[in-house]
Amino acid sequence: MQVMHPVCCGIDVHQKSIVCCILDGPLTSNEPKKYQTTFGTTTKELKAALDWILEHQVTHVFFESTGQYWIPLFNIFSDSDLELVLANPQHIKNVPGRKTDVKDAEWIAQLGRCGLINQSYIPSQEVLQLRYLTRYRLSVKQRLTQIKNHIHVILQRANIKITSYLTDIFC
């Protein structure tokens, strides 16, 4: 595989930790130096991860879009000059053999180093907030409907036939 990025970082993202693997070597080298470490996912720890990555003069950072866990990492890292590449997990084949977070991070770094990871769509902050609010509104409406239905059941079991007189008891 042809090397596209001499110094890059692959990150395996989880709820409570991120595993970073930096591959550093010339474009002609198939044996780059490897630096690996694990950080937590608090703001302070993510900033420490960013500092560690910048100390190694990384130019490209590759990570998977794992649930919502990638968003805090992206928010903190996007303030830097790093080229951030969010990968769809389905497009990154699993590591052959035994699966570990360290191997996953290295595999992501290797694929990214060779330019084999395509950038996923990253919505703007406004779109992300609108999606969140829309989903939240839908969940509130669904809960309200469940509560109303439950009240109807309670009234019927108590032989209170209020719905015979009112079309909507919640107006």
Can you annotate each of these PLM segments?
Residues L138-C171:
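Glycine-rich, often acidic, oxyanion-interacting loops/wings at catalytic, nucleic-acid
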Residues Q15, G67, H91:
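Short, glycine/acidic-enriched loop or turn micro-motifs at the edges of active sites
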Residues R131-S139:
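Short, charge/polar-rich alpha-helical segments
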Residues Q2-G25, I108:
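Gly/Thr-rich phosphate-binding beta-strand-loop-beta motif of the actin/hexokinase/Hsp70
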Residues V58-Y69:
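Short glycine-rich phosphate-binding loop at a beta-alpha junction
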Residues L27-H60:
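Nucleic-acid-processing active sites and adjacent nucleic-acid-binding tracks
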Residues S78, L84-Y132, I169-F170:
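Short alpha-helix plus adjacent loop in nuclease-associated cores
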